[in-house]
Amino acid sequence: MILTFIKIKKYRIKYLIIKKQKAFGRNNLGFITCRAKGGGIKRNLYKILDSNFANYGMSFSSAFYVNIIYDSFRRIFLAVYFIINSIIKNIYRYFLLTKNLKIGSQINFGFKAPLKIGNALPLYKILLGSFIYNIEIRYKGKGSLVKNANHNAIILMIGDIYVTVKLPSGEIKLLLKNLFCILGQLEIRRKVNKNIKKHAGFNRKLSIRPKIRGAAMNAVDHPHGGGEGKASVGFKFARTLWGKAFKGIKTRKKNKHLSRFILQHRL
C-alpha cells in the first residue's frame, strides 16, 4: 500500500504553493528597517509548511512520508506527507525533513503518538537527552523554535509544570510541558565545495546591495558622519543609522516578561 504513494510523478502541490513577494528590508510603511537588502533572484513559489501539528491529532493523527522536495526559500529540504485518516481524501502536507527518516515510514501526531523519530509529541512524553525541533512557544500555536537546518534542541529536565530545554544558541529555557514538538534531528543540506562568487555582481543575486559606511556620510545622515578628513566615530560604542548602540552592547529589554523563563542566556 505504501508503494502506491511513492509512484506519484510530481510533488508540486498547487494548494500548498502561494506567491510571496520579498520585503527588501522595508516595513509596512515602506521605510528601510534593514539596510543593504534588495534585488536578488526572482522566487515566487513559496511552499506552505504545516506547523500546527495537525491540530494535536484532531484533523488527522497519522501520515506517510512520501518524498523529499527542494525549497528555494529555506536552507533545508522539505518532506511530503500523505495524510491517511482525514475527512477529505488525497491530502498532502509539507513538513521539515527529519534526519534518518526512511521513505514510506508512518508518522503519528497527538498525545497518543508513540516515541518514534518524526512524531509530534508533547514535551513531557519525551525522554531526557532527546533531540527535538519545531517547538511551540504558546499552547495550540505554531512551531516557532529550532526550524533551521542542522539545528537541534535537547531536553534537560522534566518538571511538574515546565520542561527545561537547551536551544542551539546555548540558551536554557523553561517551556510548558504540554507544548508540542517533533522528536528527532533536522536533516543537513549537503554543501558542494564550489566557488559560486566567481562572476562580478554575484552578491546582487544574493539580495545584497552596496552598504555605505556611516563615517563616509554627512552628519545629517548618520551619527558617525561629519568631521574633517578621517574623523573618529565620536562615541564609546558604534551606533546604527537610528542612533542605537551596538557591537558589544546587549540590546534585549531587561523588563521583558518572558525573561523570567530564561535560566541561562545565549552565548
Swiss-Prot record:
Entry-linked SUPFAM superfamilies: Nucleic acid-binding proteins (SSF50249), Translation proteins SH3-like domain (SSF50104)
Gene3D superfamilies: 2.30.30.30, Nucleic acid-binding proteins, Ribosomal protein L2, domain 3
Subcellular localization(s) per the UniProt record: Plastid, Apicoplast
Pfam families, A to Z: Ribosomal_L2, Ribosomal_L2_C
Keywords (A to Z) from UniProt: Apicoplast, Plastid, Ribonucleoprotein, Ribosomal protein
Cellular component terms (Gene Ontology): apicoplast; mitochondrial large ribosomal subunit
GO biological process entries: mitochondrial translation
GO terms, molecular function: RNA binding; structural constituent of ribosome; transferase activity
Family, similarity comment: Belongs to the universal ribosomal protein uL2 family.
Subunit comment: Part of the 50S ribosomal subunit.
Protein name: Large ribosomal subunit protein uL2c
